[in-house]
């Protein structure tokens, strides 16, 4: 890159979000110059890496926090439907990418795997049945099986049944059409496609500053983290897909839209094993009920994972805490993000989130034997020697200004950008990776309003259901579901 290079598009961060946007833009505008800048030395080395997230491919098939109970006792399925719709959109893009040479090794990142909700105790069994009944009429959730017989439980989940005393009611809601997703492998394929088709990927380089230019573009200061060399890069559009680092970069840009936003980092830890006897006895992702005070991403689950062709089991998450906004970030990340325009937002959250803080304190006090004791609620026969503790990625949850409370803590993803569309970034975490395509469609529509209409025919090739609500169009859902299953090799297993 020259001393003052130019490029049409800059993507900051080499995770699933930048990878998705880059691949979409390369299809829409093959002549545009695209430069990807990553501070680390590899693709998907932070939150998109397979050991930095659970790989569920969130589709709300098993995550109980997406179907809360209303005060009158009824079940609110609206969030589950929305998240599943978003995942179907992402799945369609993956199918299109597989058919058009963007993705060439589907099994390296996507494998069929049942998604299962697990509860015990009469009251929770009753609640799970009401959840199942509420979802049963929606085509997105059709076909789920109800299992409350201990013998069938043991046949489906032998590892969880071993040494279990079935002294109270248990129940499973079994969705056979779930998946396990390695977002790291997926990111590498998408970015590989971009680079093969003219994009430039810079690794070990960090964006330190963004300055608005008189012509509406941006001048970026890029620093080589190995040599300290500084370079300038001018661009028309910046996407900040830098995970936890997005907040600080958007703050440095000076756009007014970031005012009032803050971030609260929550780390994750998991127990992991590759013992073949254990992985062979658990072929599902099984989600339990979130603990009191736990954030939505804190529901315990026992997952089979496929990483680099090998089977693993992963149990957690157990919360950790660090002021870093990235797993390989800086201790100054959190204090450095506190500004006059967001300090009231942070104070407001500190006052109102006492339950969450107590949950985090309790999690930080857990010893290794304590964590294995929690694991035994899922795997009664678990032996300490089979499991190792790993540190997963950091999630920076969004704190947004609120007139009444000062600030509110949000769990999810938020697109923040300049009104003129010249810069946009993504804040927040779960279920971000698996809803990457709807989020990038939002970025395209918000940031390229003058081109979006002309892009629609191509976008509808990528996502045939674009503009439709699949939950209200069962025939269309069946069509795109069957097509994507074939393209993604999900109907042959």
UniProtKB/Swiss-Prot annotation:
Cofactor: FAD
InterPro entries xrefs: FAD/NAD-bd_sf, MQO
EC number per UniProt: 1.1.5.4
Catalytic activity as recorded in UniProt: (S)-malate + a quinone = a quinol + oxaloacetate
Highest taxon listed in the record's lineage: Bacteria
GO molecular function annotation: 2-hydroxyglutarate dehydrogenase activity; L-malate dehydrogenase (quinone) activity
Pathway: Carbohydrate metabolism; tricarboxylic acid cycle; oxaloacetate from (S)-malate (quinone route): step 1/1
Enzyme category, top tier: oxidoreductase
Keyword field: FAD, Flavoprotein, Oxidoreductase, Tricarboxylic acid cycle
Record carries keyword Cytoplasm: no
Coiled-coil regions listed: none
Record keyword Flavoprotein present: yes
Pfam name, any one: Mqo
Classification via SUPFAM superfamilies: FAD/NAD(P)-binding domain (SSF51905)
GO biological process per UniProt: tricarboxylic acid cycle
UniProt-listed HAMAP family: MQO (MF_00212)
Family named by the database record: Belongs to the MQO family.
Protein name: Probable malate:quinone oxidoreductase
Annotated source species: Mycobacterium marinum (strain ATCC BAA-535 / M)
Lineage start: Bacteria, Bacillati, Actinomycetota, Actinomycetes, Mycobacteriales
């Amino acid at each position: 890159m020259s001393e003052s290079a130019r490029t049409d598009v800059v993507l900051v961060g080499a995770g699933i979000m930048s990878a998705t946007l880059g691949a979409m833009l390369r299809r829409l505008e093959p002549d545009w110059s695209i430069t990807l800048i990553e501070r680390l030395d590899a693709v998907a080395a932070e939150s998109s890496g397979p050991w930095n997230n659970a790989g569920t491919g969130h589709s709300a098939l098993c995550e109980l926090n997406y179907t809360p109970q209303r005060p009158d006792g009824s079940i609110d399925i609206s969030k589950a439907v929305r998240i599943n719709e978003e995942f179907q959109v992402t799945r369609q893009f993956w199918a299109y990418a597989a058919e058009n040479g963007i993705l060439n090794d589907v099994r390296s990142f996507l494998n069929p795997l049942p998604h299962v909700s697990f509860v015990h105790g009469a009251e929770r069994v009753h609640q799970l049945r009401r959840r199942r009944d509420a979802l049963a009429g929606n085509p997105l959730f059709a076909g789920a099986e109800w299992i409350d017989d201990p013998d069938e439980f043991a046949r489906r989940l032998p590892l969880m049944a071993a040494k279990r005393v079935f002294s109270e009611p248990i129940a499973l809601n079994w969705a056979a059409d779930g998946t396990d997703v390695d977002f790291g492998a997926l990111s590498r394929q998408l970015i590989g496609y971009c680079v093969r088709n003219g994009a430039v990927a810079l690794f070990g380089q960090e964006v330190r500053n963004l300055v608005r230019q008189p012509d509406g573009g941006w001048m970026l200061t890029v620093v080589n983290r190995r040599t300290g060399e500084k370079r300038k890069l001018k661009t028309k559009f910046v996407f900040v897909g830098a995970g936890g680092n997005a907040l600080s970069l958007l703050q440095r840009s000076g756009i007014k839209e970031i005012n009032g936003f803050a971030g609260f980092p929550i780390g994750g830890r998991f127990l992991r094993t590759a013992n073949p006897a254990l992985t062979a006895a658990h072929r599902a992702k099984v989600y339990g009920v979130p603990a009191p005070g736990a954030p939505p991403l804190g529901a315990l689950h026992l997952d089979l994972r496929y990483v680099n062709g090998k089977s693993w089991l992963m149990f957690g998450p157990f919360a950790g805490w660090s002021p870093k906004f990235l797993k390989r970030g800086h201790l100054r990340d959190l204090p450095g993000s506190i500004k006059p325009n967001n300090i009231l937002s942070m104070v407001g959250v500190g006052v109102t989130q006492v339950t969450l803080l107590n949950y985090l304190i309790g999690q930080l006090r857990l010893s290794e034997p304590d964590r294995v004791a929690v694991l035994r609620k899922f795997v009664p026969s678990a032996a300490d020697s089979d499991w190792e503790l790993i540190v997963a990625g950091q999630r920076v949850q969004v704190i947004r200004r609120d007139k009444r409370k000062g600030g509110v803590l949000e769990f999810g993803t938020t697109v923040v950008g300049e009104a003129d569309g010249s810069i946009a970034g993504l804040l927040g975490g779960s279920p971000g990776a698996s809803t990457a395509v709807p989020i990038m469609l939002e970025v395209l529509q918000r940031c390229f309003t003058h081109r979006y209409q002309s892009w629609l025919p191509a976008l509808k090739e990528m996502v045939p259901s674009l503009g439709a609500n699949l939950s209200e169009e069962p025939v269309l859902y069946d069509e795109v579901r069957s097509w994507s299953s074939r393209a993604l090799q999900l109907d042959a297993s």
